[in-house]
Swiss-Prot record:
Signal peptide: none annotated. The gene is rpoB. The lineage of its organism: Eukaryota, Viridiplantae, Chlorophyta, core chlorophytes, Trebouxiophyceae. This is DNA-directed RNA polymerase subunit beta. It is an enzyme of class 2 (transferase). Its EC number is 2.7.7.6. It is found in: Plastid. DNA-dependent RNA polymerase catalyzes the transcription of DNA into RNA using the four ribonucleoside triphosphates as substrates. Belongs to the RNA polymerase beta chain family.
Length: 1247
């Protein structure tokens, strides 16, 4: 079972008091421990707790009583076998729970009891796999963590409403948040009245009315307030002191005036009080609305001073007296601004186990409602069992069939399995927090698993999120990465956890610190101590990048410390804790960026996101400059096989590694892995075993390499030789120029798999109030037929013919192109099929019947027509080959009829009826341009038809079938479906997007031959040319340090591990280290041009076109280049006819909407520069974005006279042209040529 699997959780967490815990060795911590521990806690405790809340179901009726008791202590998990896992394609566990059912049948004389025990199957619960993902229906899914408001009291302002007090920014309110159920909101209105709102009630209640309804008298309410409250109207004006309680309850009754017609006028006063009390205590003040939980009770004790015990988990009447008192006190003192509600101490985090716990509770609640609805309305005992009176003993009732009771109850109880599965699947398959796992590379997957969002059910909405919510809070330090967040509408709403943040038992974030005692860091003997936010705010903490001596004694006696999230400089004697590492404040993806402190935060954000979007390429290598954290997550996600023993690797193949373990007895161990791995983004990388000269492996060694891993280290892209140089305008605006070597040597080539699924269509629709059914028949020819052919055949002639006879005659006509190993090209036939349409029009049906009765032929069945479709397709192809041999007057003879152009009128009527009744269309699937590739797999399977999309095979049988038996009739049929997987090798091409690790990205604009690229002094051609203007404005200078240090490491054959915030080692430590390595490389490699004293970091390079040196030295280096998933193959499309936006009247955007580009000012420049005058005339006049121009273009299509008008947007271009004229007498020749081109556009300029 999962709970006993030691591989599932490699780390044991020890929980201590005060919500803190520590790890024995923090260096062995797991990055996915939050998800794994949360799921483990759910399986051990959460699932049992959900069943314990619904432990006893009791359904009572006048005739019977049924008790259902769950024995949750004996909950059993059964692991799915590997063979069955391939069938269901869902990783999970079969869950069984024992139940005890007791049924009591009530009779006039005796009560009959029946009790039995059964293990109830709850179905397959999708479980967390060892890779920390949910594998459902063959697809890997990840569940995001959600940030929600913590249960408790929240004081805040509503800035969207006006305040009734002076100097107040918005309406003040107090909200009581419960872990589940309702919440209470107390607000202060413009009329100086305090109201209370309830979540499930759509109106506001005055607080005094609410307190009176709880049973407090007027005197008891006012004796709690010992300060001036004249400015606050607790009692509205329409109430007086004598009958306040009665009118308060009448006010509640008026809100429910719909009950007035049901009252008896003679007993109105009594019934009013009864209905008010019953409604109030049933819907407003019940156990669900009063539940507050432990956290809310603790807030009531600390913030309000409620005298009730902390063990009281429900709101009481006295709580609202203290809540109203503190609310008025804060209004008087304007003490609402001190509350920082966006602080993480007021937030809680939920993982996948918490969601499934809530879904299980919801499923059990739905099951309880299902039992009440289905079993409460049964009035006759005979429905359960047959009870008869014994003639000899009239007082004794005997049950004829006891199994009826048991079977009936079990049939209803078995619905619990379907209800729970529906509840679980609704979360995993349609929930907003369950998403496709971003497993494009290992970094993208582990980042997706460590991400949390403020959106989702019960939380914020994207459109309503303010800037305050999206901004960075001081409490994020060390717990939430301030850099990594998406760009666009989700900015600030989706974040990533910092490297060392852990989630505690109650959902709050914890952070480890080293203890400092007497100026010495206690990191050797004492494990790190974990603090929550409130505990951390009371400590004096220093950062983890400070230098200390050999014995952990700090050098500086005055250090910058953090106390209550405020920075200050104080003596070292007042410091109590230190952060673990400089990396504690950033996330995993951000920590992989070298020289991070030299980059702007916005560009670091882009660099973090683009590393996740990297496609595995064939020429990827390890980073020359790395941070040292790129090997950590491979072992944490358990996706890479690791040697579990110390042994001798004597054999390795594509799927296994065999080891000999040498001890007293030589034993054999084998480790399996997948040779080919496909991602959810249709990318692919191939695993290959590591071949070493020394076959000995230590425990923990990585065993395979692929496109993202090389010798156990991350390899996202190749290390290319780059130069920062403007080159003939091709790298303008961040465009990128690459060497042709990157294409020919497959350096930036990626593997992709495209899955094509084609099935026989079964559809139904109504056209002009006529029912039509469609069914598709597979045929075996590439060239199909059109129904309106010169020859038609009698269906009866082919009724008893076998299609295999026609195959044997011409087997070459039936060659199948869909074979594994063949290369699919554009236009190739993927799946040959034709569509048959049945019309249920009564007139056509009667006409068709009369025709066949007149011809004395039997009504054709659907199988006959399928055979006819295949034969007709074959004969159509045969006619095309034999057309030259046949004469024009040749007639094709069949059983009874001769079809030619001179057919009789009677025969024409028959053909017309066939065309109207059976309509055959070509629905063959042909390969598109983006579907070209190598076919690697083909699966043909039968899929059962669904009840809603069935086409009847036999019309007569279908129409004669009763409605009650149609479902059985449908289950007899299946349809065919074919799945084809195509492997594509995508070379880098124009339009593809590439980037670095520092947020420097660009589009490939030109692929230059090797002989045209700039050269180093030793003749080495440059691989990639970047625009130097992209560095100063973006302020990401870290890429310069990486490229220069990579250049030194290439010639020294070294790799470097860089720590962030290296200013602790001295002023300009990064610059000094990089230049020293460059100087060393120039000496050891005997290449003095690597380090020029006057221009350190730059080199004189040669122009490949002229063979001469450039006038100025150029910055060169080796840097890791990433190929992103945004490839032009997936995005390029052509727009011929498309939609226009309603508001802007511009073409829609995007490939899915058939969008296009409006021809504006910049497009005009491009067409002018290219010299496309006639295309410019058409696009800039007739096809412009004006409605009038489109009307002119329509007139042009309809052969009407058209006019070429000049629109207002041409004024900008005309003004620019006027600025080109220096004087009236001098006109350059090029300008005169340009003015001549403008005449073709109907644009005339007189000078």
């Amino acid at each position: 079972m999962l709970l006993n699997d030691q591989k599932f959780l490699p780390i044991n967490i020890h929980y201590l008091n005060q919500g803190r815990f520590d790890l024995n060795k923090l260096k062995n911590f797991n990055l996915l421990i939050n998800q794994r521990e949360n799921w483990r806690f759910f399986l051990i405790n959460g699932l049992k707790l959900a069943f314990k809340e619904f432990e006893h179901f009791k359904i009572k009726n006048n005739n019977f009583i049924i008790d259902i008791v769950f024995q949750e202590k004996f909950l059993f998990f059964k692991q799915i076998r590997q063979a069955y896992l391939k069938k269901v394609e869902t990783f999970g566990y079969n869950i069984f729970i024992p139940i005890i059912i007791t049924q009591k049948i009530l009779n006039k004389k005796n009560n009959l009891n029946l009790t039995f025990f059964k293990w109830l199957d709850l179905g397959i619960l999708p479980s967390l796999s060892p890779k920390t993902s949910f594998y459902i229906d063959g697809i890997s899914r990840a569940v995001s963590t959600q940030k929600k408001k913590s249960p408790g009291l929240m004081f805040d302002f509503d800035l969207t409403k006006k305040s009734s007090l002076e100097k107040r920014e918005g309406e003040a309110f107090l909200k009581i948040i419960a872990p589940r159920g309702s919440w209470f909101k107390i607000s202060y209105s413009e009329d100086h009245i305090i109201f209370i709102e309830i979540r499930n009630i759509a109106y506001k209640i005055p607080i005094f009315t609410f307190l009176c309804a709880l049973g407090f008298s007027l005197e008891s309410i006012f004796q709690f307030f010992n300060y001036n409250i004249n400015n606050f109207k607790l009692i509205p004006n329409k109430y007086d002191n004598t009958n306040a309680l009665i009118k308060a309850r009448n006010d509640i009754f008026i809100l429910y005036s719909d009950l007035l017609p049901l009252l008896n006028k003679t007993k109105k006063n009594f019934e009013i009080k009864y209905i008010i009390n019953h409604y109030f205590f049933s819907y407003i003040w019940n156990s669900n609305t009063r539940y507050c939980g432990e956290a809310t009770r603790l807030h009531l004790y600390n913030k309000v001073g409620s005298p009730l015990s902390l063990n009281s988990l429900f709101l009481e009447e006295i709580d609202f007296i203290y809540i109203t008192k503190i609310f008025i006190y804060r209004l008087i003192n304007n003490n609402f601004k001190d509350e920082n509600n966006d602080n993480l101490k007021n937030m809680r985090f939920r993982n996948g186990g918490d969601y499934i716990y809530l879904q299980t509770r919801q499923g059990l609640f739905d099951f309880e409602s299902f039992l009440n609805i289905n079993l409460h309305n049964i009035e006759n005992n005979s429905f359960f069992c047959n009870i008869t009176t014994n003639k000899k003993k009239e007082d004794i009732y005997s049950i004829k069939k006891k199994k009826n009771i048991k079977n009936f109850n079990l049939s209803k109880i078995s619905f619990l399995k379907h209800i729970l599965l529906k509840s679980w699947k609704s979360f995993f398959l349609s929930g907003t927090l369950s998403q496709f796992a971003e497993n494009l590379n290992p970094l993208s997957y582990i980042t997706h698993a460590r991400r949390f969002t403020s959106l989702g059910p019960g939380s914020l909405k994207k459109a309503e999120a303010s800037i305050e919510v999206r901004s960075i809070n001081p409490s994020y330090n060390g717990r939430v990465c301030p850099i990594e967040t998406p760009e666009g509408f989700n900015a600030g709403l989706v974040h990533s956890f910092s490297l060392y943040s852990f989630k505690g038992v109650n959902g709050e974030l914890l952070l480890p610190f080293y203890f400092i005692y007497k100026n010495i860091k206690q990191s050797y003997y004492l494990p790190p101590i974990f603090f929550n936010i409130e505990e951390e705010s009371n400590q004096s903490i220093i950062t983890g990048d400070l230098i200390h001596e050999k014995w952990n004694d700090f050098l500086n006696k005055k250090l910058s410390l953090r106390n209550n999230f405020h920075l200050d400089k104080n003596d070292i004697s007042k410091i109590s804790f230190q952060s673990l590492s400089p990396y504690h404040m950033i996330s995993l993806a951000t920590s992989l960026i070298p020289f991070l402190e030299h980059n702007d935060a916005n560009r670091a954000l882009m660099g973090s996101n683009m590393q996740r979007q990297t496609v595995p390429v064939l020429g990827a290598h390890n980073f020359i400059v790395r941070t040292g954290l790129d090997t950590k997550f491979f072992s944490d996600i358990s996706s890479i096989p690791i040697s579990q023993i110390n042994g001798f690797n004597f054999e390795s193949n594509n799927n296994y590694c065999y080891f000999y373990k040498i001890d007293n007895l030589i034993t054999l161990n084998n480790i399996s892995y997948n040779y080919i791995k496909k991602t959810n983004h249709n990318s692919l990388y191939i695993n290959e075993s590591i071949k070493k000269k020394n076959p000995w492996h230590q425990q923990g060694d990585f065993l395979i390499n692929n496109s993202v891993i090389e010798n156990g280290k991350l390899a996202l892209g190749p290390n290319l030789l780059l130069a920062y140089l403007p080159w003939h305008g091709y790298n303008y605006e961040d465009a990128v120029i690459i060497n042709e070597r990157c294409v020919s040597q497959k350096i930036l080539t990626s593997l992709h798999i495209i899955t094509l699924t084609n099935s026989l269509e079964l559809a139904y629709r109504e056209i002009n109030k006529k029912k039509e059914f469609f069914y598709e028949v597979p045929v075996k020819l590439e060239i199909l037929f059109s129904f309106f052919a010169p020859f038609y055949y009698n269906l009866k002639y082919y009724k008893n013919q076998e299609f295999s006879q026609f195959e044997k005659k011409n087997p070459s006509y039936y060659t199948n192109n869909i074979n594994i190993g063949t290369f699919l090209k554009k236009g190739d036939c993927i799946f040959s099929k034709c569509r048959i349409r049945f019309s249920f029009s009564r007139e056509l049906r009667l006409q068709y019947k009369e025709l066949f009765i007149l011809l004395r032929e039997a009504f054709p069945t659907f199988e006959d027509f399928k055979n006819f479709a295949n034969i007709f397709a074959y004969d159509k192809y045969k006619q095309k080959l034999d057309r030259k041999k046949q004469k024009k007057n040749t007639r094709l003879k069949t059983d009874n009829f001769i079809f030619n152009k001179n057919s009789t009128l009677f025969k024409k009527h028959k053909l017309k009826a066939l065309i109207n009744y059976y309509n055959i269309e070509d629905s063959t699937i042909y390969a598109q341009k983006n579907q070209e590739g190598l076919i690697i797999s083909k699966h043909l399977k039968k899929v059962p038809m669904t009840y809603t999309s069935i086409t009847p095979f036999d019309l007569e049988e279908f129409l004669s079938t009763k409605e009650s038996k149609k479902k059985e009739y449908y289950n007899l049929f299946f349809t065919k479906s074919i799945n084809i997987e195509i492997l594509q090798l995508r070379d880098i091409q124009l339009g593809d997007k590439c980037a670095g690790r520092h947020g420097n990205k660009g589009i490939i604009s030109k692929i230059c031959p090797i002989n045209e690229m700039p050269l180093l002094p030793d003749g080495t051609p440059i691989d990639i040319i970047l625009n130097p203007l992209g560095i100063p404005s973006r302020m990401n200078v870290g890429q310069i340090f990486e490229s220069l240090l990579g250049l030194a490491g290439f010639y020294l054959n070294e790799t470097y591990t860089i720590n962030i915030f290296d200013e602790q080692f001295g002023l300009e430590a990064s610059r000094s280290f990089v230049l020293s390595k460059l100087y060393k490389a120039s000496i050891l490699s005997n290449k003095p041009w690597l380090f020029l004293k006057k221009n350190a970091g730059k080199t004189n390079i040669i122009d490949g076109l002229t063979g001469k040196y450039f006038q100025q030295p150029i910055t060169i280096g080796y840097s890791s280049i990433l190929k992103l998933i945004h490839m032009v193959t997936d995005k390029l499309h052509g727009r011929s006819i498309g939609g226009y936006s309603t508001l802007t009247l511009q073409p829609t955007k995007g490939k899915s909407l058939l969008g296009g580009q409006r021809v504006g000012e910049m497009e005009l420049w491009a067409l002018q520069g290219y010299g496309a005058s006639w295309a410019l005339q058409e696009l800039y006049t007739l096809k412009s974005d004006l409605v009038e121009a489109r009307q002119h273009f329509q007139n042009y299509i309809n052969s009407f006279n058209i006019e070429s008008n000049i629109y207002d947007r041409n004024d900008i271009s005309l003004t620019e042209l006027e600025s080109l004229i220096i004087s009236d007498t001098f006109k350059p020749y090029t300008l005169e040529c340009f003015l001549e081109d403008l005449k073709a556009l109907c644009i005339y300029i007189d000078y």
